């Protein structure tokens, strides 16, 4: 049975620059589909069209009748004063309405009205089937899985950060228990435990799932088919992300081989036609014209597009000591909340250290203490004399977002004009894009720009706080390779 049918969708925001250009595909009931594509390929636009938030210029979307569809990135507006608990419980509004009607009817059952009794039976069956008797159990289970603690549930929803709102909305969406889930970057604001929990939830979910994600490990564990948006249309891969990556490269090499074969044939035919024209006989000219028509048909095949990759590497400063960093008995608290106590750590040249912990455990705070941006309450932090730190923060900010990318490299990265162009080009900022203001960049583009500023610095100690947040799949693969080579 088909849950979603997309037929010849077209959408453009600027005349002559289509985002979707005849997009056609279908999703069967129970499928787990990854929606992939470069930044700007139209993935989020597609989701917004599926949910009715935007209208396509033409084409149609057909959803299976009666199926409910939920989108994680769609954060509704709630009444002023709503707490996290209130927002989560809106998932049960329909069940609560049924419960209220059941109570109302039960007070009238003594009348012996058969129609009323039949209505009560139907409502009770629907209430039970919808999980009405399991509301509290489901709420506690999902909050535990996504790390939403009891005290956090008392906070005002309006006061939460964008990431926190997204996590609460994910929990609410799961509680609603829709038949079709649309997940747009669901792991961006989840810690490791919550991500593992979400993977397990999806594996047991009985409905249909469409996922946009730049986390290839998450994709490998949650999807069984890929729809890639490319030039406004769909390309299909019957497997998870690992299959997609291998198959995409195989297709590219096969298309390139075919293209080169055709170009060689065009060259041979062109030379044959040229010689025939030189003889300038009626018979040979006719044959030459026939060959030239054949060449025109062959010339319609475009060279397959090679995937652009980032090419920069971290600059490396010399280091003349064993200890880059030492922490001894470091502790930190905010009021009565102790983040960590008696932290002792020694970092030596060549170490690769992962800092793990639940959301709120103090990972970013510890990094800020190491960098001198946050004072510790006790203990000592010492850096080696020749340490040169390269730091990528979790929240990317620029001191002058009104500046263009080009000017940012000139004034904040100390580049001359040619260096600015060259370094931006290595990070796939080319042509007129370098004159866009930083303020209009997407989260992924801002991360790339910050990395561009960082990469040519001579550093010997990298501190990366959630470095893959907002980066696309290619950029994530690149940063892994760059760190491995550092």
Residue ranges and their predicted role:
Residues 207, 278, 300-303, 460:
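Generic structural signal for secondary-structure transition and capping sites
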Residues 149, 278-280, 284, 309:
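Short, flexible, glycine-rich and Lys/Arg-enriched loop motifs at helix boundaries
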Residues 125, 276-277:
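Charged, low-complexity surface segments at secondary-structure and domain boundaries
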Residues 105, 112, 130, 269, ...:
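Hydrophobic stripe of amphipathic alpha-helices that form coiled-coil interfaces
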Residues 248-272, 284, 288-302:
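Intracellular alpha-helical coupling/juxtamembrane segments of multi-pass membrane proteins
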Residues 1-255, 259, 308, 317-486:
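ABC ATP-binding cassette signature C-motif
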Residues 9-11, 271-275:
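Short N-terminal helix-initiation segments at or just after the protein's N-terminus
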């Amino acid at each position: 049975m088909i849950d979603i049918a997309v037929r010849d969708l077209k959408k453009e925001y600027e005349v002559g620059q289509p985002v979707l250009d005849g997009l056609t595909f279908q999703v069967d009931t129970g499928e787990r589909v990854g929606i992939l594509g470069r930044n700007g390929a139209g993935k989020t636009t597609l989701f917004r069209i599926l949910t009715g938030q935007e209208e396509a210029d033409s084409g149609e979307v057909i959803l299976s009748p009666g199926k409910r569809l939920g989108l994680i990135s769609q954060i509704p507006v709630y009444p002023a004063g709503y707490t996290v608990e209130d927002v989560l419980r809106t998932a049960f509004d329909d069940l609560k309405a049924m419960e209220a009607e059941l109570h109302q009817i039960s007070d009238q059952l003594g009348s012996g009205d058969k129609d009323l009794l039949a209505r009560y039976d139907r409502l009770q069956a629907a209430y039970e089937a919808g999980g009405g008797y399991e509301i509290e159990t489901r709420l506690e289970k999902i909050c535990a899985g996504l790390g939403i603690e009891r005290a956090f549930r008392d906070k005002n929803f309006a006061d939460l950060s964008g990431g926190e709102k997204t996590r609460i909305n994910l929990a609410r969406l799961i509680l609603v228990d829709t038949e079709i889930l649309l997940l747009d970057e669901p792991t961006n604001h989840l810690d490791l435990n919550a991500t593992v929990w979400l993977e397990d939830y999806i594996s047991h979910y009985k409905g249909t799932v469409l996922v946009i994600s730049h986390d290839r490990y998450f994709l490998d564990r949650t999807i069984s088919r890929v729809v890639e948006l490319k030039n406004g249309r769909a390309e299909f891969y019957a497997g998870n992300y690992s299959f997609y990556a291998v198959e995409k490269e195989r297709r590219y090499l096969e298309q390139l081989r075919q293209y080169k074969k055709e170009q060689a044939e065009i060259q041979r035919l062109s030379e044959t036609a040229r010689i025939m024209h030189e003889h300038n006989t009626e018979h040979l000219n006719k044959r030459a014209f026939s060959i030239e028509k054949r060449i025109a048909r062959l010339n319609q095949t475009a060279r397959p597009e090679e995937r652009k990759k980032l090419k920069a590497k971290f600059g490396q400063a010399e280091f003349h000591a064993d200890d880059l960093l030492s922490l001894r008995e470091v502790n930190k608290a905010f009021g009565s909340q102790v983040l960590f106590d008696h932290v002792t750590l020694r970092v030596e040249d060549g170490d690769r250290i992962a800092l793990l912990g639940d959301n709120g455990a103090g990972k970013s705070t510890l990094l800020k203490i190491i960098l001198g941006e946050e004072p510790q309450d006790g203990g000592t932090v010492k850096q080696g004399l020749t340490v040169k730190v390269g730091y990528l923060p979790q929240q990317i900010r620029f001191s002058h977002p009104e500046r263009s990318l080009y000017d940012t490299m000139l004034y904040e990265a100390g580049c001359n004009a040619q260096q600015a162009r060259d370094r931006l080009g290595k990070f796939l900022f080319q042509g007129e894009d370098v004159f866009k203001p930083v303020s209009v960049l997407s989260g992924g583009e801002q991360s790339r720009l910050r990395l561009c500023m960082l990469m040519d610095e001579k550093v010997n100690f990298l501190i990366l706080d959630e470095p893959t947040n907002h980066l696309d799949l290619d950029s994530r693969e690149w940063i892994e390779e760059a760190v491995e080579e550092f």
